[in-house]
Amino acid sequence: MDMSEIPEPLRLRAFRLLMQTMDQHDAHAWLSNCAKTPENLRFLIEGAGIVGDPSYLPWLIQQMTNPKTARLAGEAFSLITGLDLVNSDMERKPPDGGDAGPTDDPEDPNVETDPDDGLPWPDPNRISRWLEVNGSRFESGTRYFLGAGVTRENCIMALKDGYQRQRILAAHYLCLLEPGTVLFEWRAPAYRQQRLLAAMH
């Protein structure tokens, strides 16, 4: 399937939710089919992180060597393992031109926003060594979310301490775990979110 055939602006949101709702077997099959189209590489990387199977981790490290996919692959790796690339000193300096994006120059033809803006540049060598030491903690065929299972407790922790895209996934997981749950409003003012989180215990 070519994801470009799905109309924007809901394409990426629909894809993420699809990956969250699919079981492991169906998700692997879907991603394998997705991999047949080179233009789907970014979807494939993000999907691997959401599916959460640690069998994807070595492949994600390979994607970190490509400047075009490095940061997204790092985010996907963190999504599975829970490894904070910044606090664990697993990031590197951006390559020359790696942070290229829109400028203030009216003559600059590059007007597209960098979809990975704000994500750290992962160091594949350090991360590979980390995986050699810690890989035995993860069981292939199991869905992981930030280093643990997809549980209510883990999702609440992600809502409290996670990055924004992790928090969005956690909010959706809570609804999937407990059908009928009102979707946590991650866009609400901070004080309101804190009040909602306090009521979830």
Regions found by a protein language model. Give the residues of each.
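Long, helix-rich interaction regions
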Residues: 1-201
